[in-house]
Amino acid sequence: MRPLTPRQAEILELIKCNIAETGMPPTRAEIAKRLGFKSANAAEEHLKALAKKGCIEIIPGTSRGIRLAQTEELEEQGLPLIGQVAAGEPILAQEHVEQHYQVDPNMFHPSADFLLRVRGDSMKDIGILEGDLLAVHKAEQARNGQVVVARVEDDVTVKRFEKKGSTVYLHAENEDYSPIVVDLTNQSLSIEGLAVGVIRNGDWQ
């Protein structure tokens, strides 16, 4: 497969995530809105380029006529590794992707959608250490007790999730850290994904 431009890679990632979350690909208008294009026509041009490179198939006559090409080359791209996440930006925005690791997403359950570089030691007591690569399954909801990647206002954090009424507690696994308390009546919180595994940085090159 021919190499992708950064913008093409970003659109391909958006398509894959949309299918994983909703079961269907985005429309051209949705792609344009998510990525700041002035019109759906701009998205269409990028889709045509992705089709020429063998990443997707375009199905005429339908607004969601995009199908991922299940090629060996596409699978070999691996999981995107997310580094520092800028405030207010989508976690899978192309500028956050440091590289791709040749990791089989299905070695985790549920399957991983991306890797997140761990910063800090707030989860060290359950073996999530500074510099580790956290395998994350993209999700928008969580059950109490699950370890989540959460966005509180503009900050992204990895913590254990607990919800009581309209209050969410994001617990560290390190006694040196107090829980992050989020009042959902006046603070924004979104779940970016669920932790499904850890790769010790250096063990997978």
From Swiss-Prot:
It catalyses: Hydrolysis of Ala-|-Gly bond in repressor LexA. The active site is at S122 (for autocatalytic cleavage activity), K159 (for autocatalytic cleavage activity). CDD domains: S24_LexA-like (cd06529). Gene3D superfamilies: Umud Fragment, subunit A, Winged helix-like DNA-binding domain superfamily/Winged helix DNA-binding domain. The keyword Transcription applies. GO terms for molecular function: DNA binding; serine-type endopeptidase activity. The record marks A87, G88 as: Cleavage. Represses a number of genes involved in the response to DNA damage (SOS response), including recA and lexA. In the presence of single-stranded DNA, RecA interacts with LexA causing an autocatalytic cleavage which disrupts the DNA-binding part of LexA, leading to derepression of the SOS regulon and eventually DNA repair. Homodimer. NCBIfam families: lexA (TIGR00498). This is LexA repressor. It comes from Shewanella woodyi (strain ATCC 51908 / MS32).
